[in-house]
């Protein structure tokens, strides 16, 4: 009996084991069939899967271990009890990013390259995706523009376009016979298009013209192709060329793309060539591919710059064969059709044909004197005559009703300056008499706002021959001439005014009216005529119409402007780059002592942030020069700072500073226990920022911008005046860190808030007195220097 029972159990076990193996084989086979159906295009030879024999009883016992219970809240993630909610959310987001990137990269290889990726390249792409180096759709564009994908498409097009034709075999044999690569002609006019078929009207030319230049000479007689819509191939044209610089010797630093000399030369070359190529329609950008040494005919060594000019094409022009067969007949220019890179969609423009574009590029490169001589002037300034005497025909015609008491328009719009030949012979200043040295202004007329005139406030000059120092006086606005200036449109500027301090005056007694007696002594001998109306005076910088005083005895200077691109930032007029930024520290309490720059708490906090920011900015930003903490504001603690850089840096300044501060924010939060809020980062370049935005003057004062120093200062409001010194009593300026105290009908000194009124004010008073002396001395020097330069250049012939 026992023997029969054992025999029955043995037979049952054998039966269950065989049945389990059969079920496993069926499941594996069915899964393989499904995978093959899902990927019909991938043709790979895979080895037969090895089926491991697993006991049915073992699988039954292992089933509970595999099917672990998931969390009801997060069914796809394992939650550890010791993790916080923030850590759990971060883990889920990281896992989600990983899975999405894996799917994106896998599908990109399947769709565009029709193959399974290698482990190393797959991990590289997944890593780039996780770091957000590429957007998800940018990954697809990168794969679609790869050479492997283009070659695969060309192969598929050939296979599907010529099915079962006998002449296809002969054509393929002809193509495979030669061992040398075909020679591509360098001139469009000599390029043979005879063997190339002319398709019918309903055939998309992009399938035929998307092949490379070496495929053009392949003989074929087919005239029909199956339409394959590939719209991104023809949206841009890239032309490679090189420029030889005979007077620039090649340096070893140019072989390293990370060296400062390499980056500086790249930025300067791009800036100069963009000015030349922007004349061509459709020009997008220019790239520097590298530098290489070149030996000249005389045996000397020179530098050759390899560049690439990119032109944008619209959809209509993409269907023109000439746009794909661009080749320039020049010893310095080579054209190549390249299908790489991410293509940006631009608005359609009017483009020239390939032949016209070739001629224009050659004319630009050969016609530019700097390129012919092998020298590229990497500067924004040109030297030349500063002033051009204006003759009567150059003046605008007066209106029908002209009166002598008419006034000039205070402001005129600005136009882009351009260079024009200067003729100094036989011209005089309007109103100048040859018998005496006095200059009476011509009859002024009302001039309406015009788009062809620069934004200069008109000036009236008068000269007194009897005064020992023949100083020239100016009207409301003036500019100081410099040795080198940007190009100026001489056809529209009647006179380039002299930069000096502007002062109100009376036309009757010609006396200088000002509230500062010290300034009168420094500028003795000046007189001003033709007083503008009070409404016009109020529009000038620093004039308070209520008190009738000039708050700032300065003249507005041209606004600082930065040239900013994706790869560099350059300051114009030889100035340095300046960036203002502010950040908020949430976990730091604010104290009113931080309003006073002389307090110990302010100085300690200033030193703390200086020690934190300066090393980080210096090590991460090329060209960093100085950091200045401007002030602290209430709102936890808001730190307002100013950073100075070199005149040019090889990166986008605003984006680079933001990136460094974002990195610093996370570092400070971890190591220094400073919670710097990300959304509070406010970064502005100096050409766009308002200096008064970062200065807190209190409710009894207002911020005033000093046009000479480009700095912001606090000025007491009317009725809340300062008595610290004679100078600041006149200008009503509070020292930085001081606030004005209320006092009606009597002046009260500018002093800190009530809790710190007993602090000594001597350091601040001395500093302010010294600043005033510097400003007055500068005004006097600039007036004398400006007059001497004007007299030497324009009155020499008279």
From Swiss-Prot:
The keyword Signal applies. InterPro entries: IMPG, SEA_dom, SEA_dom_sf. One of its GO terms (cellular component) is photoreceptor outer segment. Residues 430-446 have a biased composition (Low complexity). Highly glycosylated (N- and O-linked carbohydrates and sialic acid). Residues 235-357, 575-688 form the SEA domain. Glycans are attached at residues 142, 174, 186, 457, 473-474, 477, 559, 596, 620, 634, 652. It is found in: Cell projection, Cilium, Photoreceptor outer segment; Secreted, Extracellular space, Extracellular matrix, Interphotoreceptor matrix; Photoreceptor inner segment. A motif (Heparin- and hyaluronan-binding) lies at residues 625-633. It comes from the Eukaryota. Coiled coil: none annotated. One of its GO terms (molecular function) is hyaluronic acid binding. Abundantly expressed in the retina (at protein level). Keywords: Cell projection, Extracellular matrix, Glycoprotein, Heparin-binding, Hyaluronic acid, Receptor, Repeat, Secreted, Sialic acid, Signal. GO terms for biological process: extracellular matrix organization; visual perception. Residues 1-20 form the signal peptide. Residues 424-446, 745-773 are annotated as: Disordered. Chondroitin sulfate-, heparin- and hyaluronan-binding protein. May serve to form a basic macromolecular scaffold comprising the insoluble interphotoreceptor matrix. This is Interphotoreceptor matrix proteoglycan 1. It comes from Mus musculus. The gene is Impg1.
């Amino acid at each position: 009996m026992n023997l029969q029972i054992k025999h029955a159990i043995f037979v049952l076990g054998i039966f269950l084991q065989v049945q389990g193996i059969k079920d496993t084989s069926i499941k594996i086979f069915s899964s393989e069939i499904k995978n093959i159906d899902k990927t019909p295009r991938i043709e790979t030879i895979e080895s037969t899967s090895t089926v491991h024999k697993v006991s049915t009883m073992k699988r039954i016992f292992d089933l509970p271990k595999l099917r672990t219970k998931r969390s009801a809240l997060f069914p796809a993630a394992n939650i550890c009890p010791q993790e916080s909610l923030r850590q759990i959310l971060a883990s889920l987001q990281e896992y989600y990013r990983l899975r999405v990137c894996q799917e994106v990269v896998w599908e990109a290889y399947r769709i565009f390259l029709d193959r399974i990726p290698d482990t190393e390249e797959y991990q590289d792409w997944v890593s780039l995706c996780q770091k957000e180096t590429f957007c998800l759709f940018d990954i697809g564009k990168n794969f679609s523009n790869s050479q492997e994908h283009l070659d695969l498409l060309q192969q598929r097009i050939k296979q599907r376009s010529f099915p079962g034709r006998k002449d296809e075999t002969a054509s393929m044999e002809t193509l495979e016979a030669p061992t040398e690569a075909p020679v591509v002609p360098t001139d469009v006019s000599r390029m043979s298009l005879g063997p190339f078929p002319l398709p019918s009207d309903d055939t998309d030319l992009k399938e035929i013209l998307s092949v490379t230049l070496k495929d053009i000479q392949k003989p074929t007689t087919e005239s029909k192709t199956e339409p394959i819509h590939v719209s991104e191939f023809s949206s841009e044209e890239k032309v490679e060329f090189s420029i030889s610089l005979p007077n620039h010797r090649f340096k070893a630093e140019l072989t390293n793309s990370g060296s400062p000399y390499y980056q500086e030369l790249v930025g300067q070359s791009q800036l100069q060539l963009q000015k030349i190529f922007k004349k061509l329609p459709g020009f997008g950008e220019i790239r520097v591919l590298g530098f290489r040494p070149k030996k000249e005919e005389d045996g000397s060594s020179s530098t050759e710059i390899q560049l690439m000019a990119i032109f944008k094409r619209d959809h209509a022009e993409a269907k023109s064969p000439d746009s794909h067969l661009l080749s320039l007949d020049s010893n310095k220019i080579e054209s190549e059709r390249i299908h790489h890179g991410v293509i940006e969609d631009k608005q359609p423009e009017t483009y020239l044909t390939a032949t016209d574009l070739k001629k224009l590029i050659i004319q630009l490169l050969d016609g530019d004197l700097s390129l012919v001589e092998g020298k590229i002037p990497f500067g924004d300034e040109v030297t030349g005559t500063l002033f051009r005497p204006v003759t009567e025909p150059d003046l605008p015609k007066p209106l029908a009703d002209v009166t002598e008491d008419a006034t000039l328009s205070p402001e005129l719009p600005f136009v882009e300056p351009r260079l024009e030949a200067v003729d100094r012979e036989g011209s005089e200043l309007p109103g100048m008499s040859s018998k005496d040295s006095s200059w009476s202004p011509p009859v002024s007329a009302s001039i309406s706002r015009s788009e062809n005139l620069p934004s200069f406030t008109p000036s009236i000059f008068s000269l007194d021959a009897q005064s020992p120092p023949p100083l020239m006086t100016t009207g409301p606005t003036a500019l100081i001439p410099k040795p080198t200036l940007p190009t100026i449109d001489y056809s529209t500027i009647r006179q380039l005014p002299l930069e000096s301090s502007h002062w109100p005056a009376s036309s009757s007694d010609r006396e200088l009216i000002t509230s500062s007696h010290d300034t009168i002594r420094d500028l003795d001998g000046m007189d001003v005529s033709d007083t503008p109306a009070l409404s016009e005076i109020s529009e000038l910088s620093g004039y308070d119409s209520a008190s009738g005083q000039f708050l700032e005895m300065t003249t507005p200077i041209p606004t600082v402007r930065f040239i900013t691109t994706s790869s560099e930032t350059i300051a114009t007029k030889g100035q340095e780059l300046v960036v203002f930024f502010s950040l908020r520290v949430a976990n730091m309490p604010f104290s009113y002592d931080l309003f006073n720059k002389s307090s110990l708490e302010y100085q300690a906090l200033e030193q703390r942030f200086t020690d934190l920011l300066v090393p980080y900015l210096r090590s991460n930003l090329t060209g960093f020069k100085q950091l200045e903490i401007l002030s602290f504001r209430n709102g936890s603690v808001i730190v307002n700072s100013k950073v100075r850089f070199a005149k040019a840096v090889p990166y986008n300044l605003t984006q680079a500073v933001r990136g460094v501060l974002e990195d610093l924010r996370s570092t400070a939060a971890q190591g220094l226990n400073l919670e710097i809020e990300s959304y509070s980062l406010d970064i502005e370049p100096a050409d766009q920022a308002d200096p008064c935005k970062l200065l807190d003057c209190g409710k009894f004062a207002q911020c005033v911008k000093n046009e000479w120093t480009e700095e912001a200062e606090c000025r007491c409001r009317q009725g809340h005046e300062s008595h610290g010194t004679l100078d600041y009593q006149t200008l009503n300026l509070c020292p930085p860190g001081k606030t004005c105290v209320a006092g009606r009908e009597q002046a009260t000194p500018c002093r800190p808030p009530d809790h710190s009124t007993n602090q000594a004010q001597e350091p601040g008073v001395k500093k302010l007195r010294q600043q005033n002396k510097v400003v007055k001395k500068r005004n006097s020097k600039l007036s004398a220097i400006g007059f001497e330069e004007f007299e030497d250049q324009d009155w020499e012939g008279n």
